[in-house]
Design a protein with these regions (language model features):
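Short loop->beta-strand "edge-of-pocket" segments that line small-molecule binding or catalytic clefts
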Residues: 23-28, 42, 129, 157-175
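Short helices/loops that flank or line small-molecule/ion binding pockets
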Residues: 38, 50, 68-91, 103-109, ...
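Ligand-binding cleft/hinge of the Venus flytrap
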Residues: 36, 49-65, 158, 171-194, ...
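Flexible hinge/capping segments at coil-to-helix
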Residues: 134-137, 146-166
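Extracytoplasmic small-molecule ligand-binding "clamshell" domains
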Residues: 18-102, 193
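Periplasmic-binding protein-like
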Residues: 27-29, 116-130, 135-143, 216, 263-279, ...
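A ligand-binding cleft/hinge motif common to bilobed small-molecule-binding domains
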Residues: 84, 92-122, 177-180, 205-240
Length: 303
């Protein structure tokens, strides 16, 4: 293949961008954040994207993609690849952590699966750019969830987990927090379940365990599917959490500045909380600093 042919193939792989549109990449399977099944779409991130596009006087186009909800390099690389391939202007539902922003650790990566993608797209490699965030529009937190039949005492600190049967998904941030709390004081009460295989909240519902520490969005999604549930959010939220926003390439700084103004307007008018309530999501406002430091083991120590 000639050099010109290679260039033509690369340009041909990039989608055409219509004037007056705002294209946002959203994960297709994170209930209450963003969901796409057939013609059905829903979620808080989708509503925020719609509201931002309206304030920018643009038509929203959503590029749905597939990736796991993990705050690690997988999401970071997937997001960067989609943006660098011009699949979207921005990507929503992104954790604002220093290690997930800026220049990537690798220069080239494959694209994640995305709606409309072909076999050639799955094989292609994309040169990555520098990620730049918008201001956050909500916060992702870990919350104590209890079986309301078995646990009646208030849970206001991790000390209140003492004496309860604790279930936790192994290898997660919640696992690290509970296993290291007060030099392992809760270790003998903890049962580890396997993420994506064991039904953590279902096991809690059955009475096999008393309490867990889980992302509040997951609990909200469980309640939406099981309105008669015995499970309750006990009120305790761990201090370690992550602000969530949109992310784009640093070359889109002007667009990101405009989006910042739109998000600020939505926040000032109380629209963000109303949009979250409309999809059944407990709204937690962002906290300073807007961008969190990378988590170290020393951060897990009780403060």
């Amino acid at each position: 293949m000639t050099v010109l042919a290679v260039i033509a193939a690369t340009l041909g792989a990039q989608p055409a961008r219509a004037e007056g549109t705002l294209t946002v990449c959203l994960n297709e399977d994170i209930p209450l954040y963003s969901l796409h099944h057939g013609k059905e779409t829903s979620g808080f991130d989708l509503k925020v994207a719609e509201a931002v596009a309206q304030r920018l006087d643009r038509k929203l186009v959503v590029q749905w993609f597939e990736t796991k909800l993990e705050m690690d390099s997988s999401l970071t690389i997937d997001a960067n690849a989609l943006l660098s391939d011009k699949r979207c202007d921005l990507l929503g539902g992104y954790p604002l952590i220093k290690g997930t922003l800026g220049k990537p650790r690798v220069e080239i990566a494959r694209l994640p699966g995305f709606d409309g993608g072909t076999a050639d797209d799955r094989r292609r490699r994309v040169r990555l750019g520098e990620l730049m965030p918008t201001r956050p529009y909500h916060r992702s937190v870990l919350a104590a969830v209890v079986n309301g039949t078995a646990v009646t005492k208030p849970i206001t600190t991790l000390a209140d987990f003492d004496g309860l049967r604790i279930a936790i998904e192994g290898g997660t941030l919640a696992d690290a927090i509970l296993m290291t709390w007060r030099d392992g004081r809760l270790v003998k009460q903890i049962t580890h379940l396997i993420p994506e295989r064991d039904d953590l909240l279902g096991r809690l519902e059955s009475g096999a365990f008393d309490v867990t520490l889980v992302n509040l969005r997951r609990f909200d999604a469980y309640v939406a599917k099981n309105p008669g549930t015995k499970l309750k959010a006990a009120g305790f939220q761990h201090r370690i959490g992550f602000n969530m926003g949109l992310v784009g390439l640093a070359t889109s700084a002007d667009l990101i500045a405009a989006v910042d103004k739109a998000i600020a307007d939505l926040d000032q008018k109380g629209e963000l909380a109303r949009m979250a309530a409309a999809v059944g999501l407990t709204y937690v406002p962002p906290r300073a600093p807007q961008i969190a430091d990378n988590i170290a083991m020393s951060d897990l120590a009780e403060k």
